[in-house]
A protein has these predicted regions:
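Non-catalytic structural scaffold of enzyme domains
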Residues: 1-184
Length: 184
């Protein structure tokens, strides 16, 4: 029988989305939210590497002890880009999967991409991953925390997209040559 998987994200809403994603595949998750809201998450992401590693390592260790977890599913782009999960995986023995793993694999297929992330820390981590995988890639990015706050409040998607003028932003990225838009 498969052991439960740590589901970690920056906020409770994102963490629950990750839990729902795994549950749809019949996989049991262990809820591990880093912060209580996007503002606290951003503060966490700009804390020192040592502080971030200590918090994540402690949560991994708790899940290992309480639930026997051997794997972690990081369901948060900005968190993935701001924490060194490779080092934490080595230290804890937890196998970690993040969105950056997917981006690393996809980057060589493109010449130009656009990135919309929750904040600049998340965008920087995503860009670093993409450029390490494809140094010739042209990137344009935006960090838009108000969009994340609207999602957290449960704003209807159509209203959110219109209010934050996301179609215009996507059109601008496309006009600048972006072949695809990565929503981080």
């Amino acid at each position: 029988m498969m052991r439960p998987v740590i589901v970690m994200a920056g906020t409770p809403v994102d963490t629950q989305m990750g839990m729902d994603c795994l549950a749809a595949q019949g996989v049991e998750g262990v809820f591990c939210s880093i912060s209580k809201d996007p503002v606290e998450q951003t503060a966490f992401q700009i804390s020192s590497e040592r502080e971030k590693a200590a918090v994540v390592t402690a949560l991994f260790r708790e899940a290992q002890a309480a639930h026997g977890c051997e794997q972690a599913f990081i369901y948060c782009n900005s968190l993935s880009g701001s924490v060194d999960f490779d080092a934490i995986a080595r230290e804890t023995g937890v196998a970690v999967v993040t969105p950056l793993d997917v981006y690393r694999a996809l980057a060589p297929q493109y010449r130009s991409l656009a990135v919309i992330a929750a904040n600049a820390q998340g965008a920087a981590g995503i860009e670093r991953t993409l450029l390490l995988s494809n140094p010739d890639l042209t990137l344009r990015s935006a960090g838009i925390l108000p969009v994340v706050l609207a999602i957290e409040r449960g704003e209807e998607p159509e209203e959110l997209v219109e209010r934050h003028r996301l179609p215009e932003l996507a059109d601008w990225f496309a006009a600048q040559g972006a072949e695809a838009l990565l929503l981080g």
